[in-house]
Amino acid sequence: MSVNYAAGLSPYADKGKCGLPEIFDPPEELERKVWELARLMWQSSSVVFHTGAGISTASGIPDFRGPHGVWTMEERGLAPKFDTTFENARPSKTHMALVQLERMGFLSFLVSQNVDGLHVRSGFPRDKLAELHGNMFVEECPKCKTQYVRDTVVGTMGLKATGRLCTVAKTRGLRACRGELRDTILDWEDSLPDRDLMLADEASRTADLSVTLGTSLQIRPSGNLPLATKRRGGRLVIVNLQPTKHDRQADLRIHGYVDEVMCRLMKHLGLEIPAWDGPCVLDKALPPLPRPVALKAEPPVHLNGAVHVSYKSKPNSPILHRPPKRVKTEAAPS
């Protein structure tokens, strides 16, 4: 649970602004804004999504700065509520929608600040995913950089030794690497993983559309990555119930529950959200499936100029691809 994760971090005074009031767009305005997002995605050649804790609240994992977030409740001297464990949490509709968007070629890369492992367990391809703050289910060998995805949380935090050794053979016929495996969870002062940060930065700089979901964008440098898209002339869409650090930079701000926004988005794109059939780890993305032939018909909603978005006419541009990451997937030894 994020409660245990937060409790495992070192003491840190500046946790950002917590408990800000939530904003809800009226239903017609929300529908129109999601339609605008669908058009932007359809006409963009490279789309990057940036996700935060807000996409996992529907999975029973509390966020940090929301009205009932871990740190918000901590400031009030109250205990946060939680409904599940990391192992029992199920991917939300948003997690599964992102899987389908990648599968259909609408999503080029995914950058996440979440440590709950739900993107990986949902089946999102790891070669198109940067987990900037780590993953509770992943441990890594510091010698050969091989990562192991476990079926339970690894049990430590702060890049500490987990007590297991790397089993990858150095070369054929020689003994195993036997490097001391460590968790991948960052503490406050730890540097972001070089590879994930490099891929996230490259994807953000080359994208013509960045979409943030369920994040207040307060943590640096993760929260500033979407601005790299803006600096290169791309568009920025922010989906969050609370105000974010970069609202003024956004071309479109959508205030609604992320699951509702993603369900509406998938409907406009003519896509179904797949069901989750249990934990599934996909190391490398599959070739994209054919897209629907066109967007669904535009809804007859007019907002008297409340939404202003410009579009680029590049519906058939190529999709950005990323190199695979060396990953070993297995259950943790008992």
From Swiss-Prot:
Note in the entry: Compared to beaver, mouse SIRT6 displays lower histone deacetylase activity and ability to promote double-strand break (DSB) repair, possibly leading to shorter life span.
Protein name per the record: NAD-dependent protein deacylase sirtuin-6
Keywords: Acetylation, Acyltransferase, Chromatin regulator, Chromosome, Developmental protein, DNA damage, DNA repair, DNA-binding, Endoplasmic reticulum, Glycosyltransferase, Isopeptide bond, Metal-binding, NAD, Nucleotidyltransferase, Nucleus, Phosphoprotein, RNA-binding, Telomere, Transferase, Tumor suppressor, Ubl conjugation, Zinc
Tissue expr: Highest levels are found in muscle, thymus, spleen, brain and heart (at protein level).
Cofactor note text: Binds 1 zinc ion per subunit.
Subunit organization: Homodimer; binds to nucleosomes and DNA ends as a homodimer. Interacts with RELA; interferes with RELA binding to target DNA. Interacts with SMARCA5; promoting recruitment of SMARCA5/SNF2H to double-strand breaks (DSBs) sites. Interacts with the mTORC2 complex; preventing the ability of SIRT6 to deacetylate FOXO1. Interacts with the CLOCK-BMAL1 complex; recruited by the CLOCK-BMAL1 complex to regulate expression of clock-controlled genes. Interacts with CSNK2A2; preventing CSNK2A2 localization to the nucleus.
Gene3D superfamilies attached to this UniProt entry: 2.20.28.200, TPP-binding domain
This protein's record includes keyword Metal-binding: yes
Enzyme class: transferase
S-S bonds: none
Cofactor: Zn(2+)
Glycyl lysine isopeptide (Lys-Gly) (interchain with G-Cter in ubiquitin) cross-link, renumbered residues: K170
Induction: By cold. In hepatocytes, expression is increased following incubation in a ketonic medium.
PTM info: Acetylated at Lys-33. Deacetylation at Lys-33 by SIRT1 promotes homomultimerization and binding to double-strand breaks (DSBs) sites. Phosphorylation at Ser-10 by MAPK8/JNK1 in response to oxidative stress stimulates the mono-ADP-ribosyltransferase activity on PARP1, leading to PARP1 recruitment to double-strand breaks (DSBs).
Localisation: Nucleus; Chromosome; Chromosome, Telomere; Endoplasmic reticulum
Phenotype caused by lack of the gene: Mice display multiple defects, accelerated aging and die a few weeks after birth, because of impaired genomic stability. Mice do not show any visible phenotype at birth and undergo a normal development during the first two weeks, except for reduced growth. By two/three weeks of age, mice in a 129/SvJ background display severe metabolic defects and develop abnormalities usually associated with aging. These include acute loss of subcutaneous fat, lordokyphosis, erosion of the superficial colon epithelium, severe lymphopenia, osteopenia and severely reduced IGF1 serum levels.
Residues bearing the modification N-acetylserine: S2
Phosphoserine: residues bearing it: S10
